[in-house]
Amino acid sequence: MATPFWYNAALALLKPIYQSRIRKRAEHPEQLQQELLERFGPFQPAKNLHAIWFHVVSVGETNAAQPLIEHYLKAGQPVLVTKTTKTGQARAKSLFLKAPYLDLFQAVYLPADQVHLIREFYQKYQPKLLALVETELWPNLIDQAQHFQVPCLLINARLSEKSAKGYAKVKGLTRGMLQKLQANLAKAAKPATTPSAVNP
């Protein structure tokens, strides 16, 4: 089931505000241009197709995913990491964008959760698996994973009371989104601290 019309319409209306916020916090013109391209396209070419894709939010989630990312890189498996914050971007690159992983690792910002952008991202990168670290969940990101038959996992999840209340307010959106997750490796049920937890 596709995401609701009202959700996609709201994202389209908010796009100028989102772009304005990115421009205000940009430190250099080059960084601004790069972030806008990664969030709104046209997207840069994939370094490797069929990578294991980790979506992390910021530094904490990057650190939590580090053992799993290292496991795949050491095994010669390409890894793609997307983030939503500048600090998360910097942390991921400092950890992995260096020898001996330069040819296997790629880090970019997660595109805005608009259908056409997310669909284009899946088509360009063709990931083997999507692992969502923690609980930053985007409806079109998950919906298109199902559309492109990309297994989608939720790992190391902690749902705060604030987040739970927020999700409860939009059950029509979140219920379908959560049903599309093929596995929920919530920390309370099964700790995802070993690479075997998400082996495809």
Tell me the role of every PLM-derived stretch:
Residues Q19, R23-R39, P45-P200:
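Active-site and donor-binding regions of nucleotide-sugar-utilizing enzymes
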Residues M1-I22, A26, R175:
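Short hydrophobic helices that act as membrane-entry/anchoring signals
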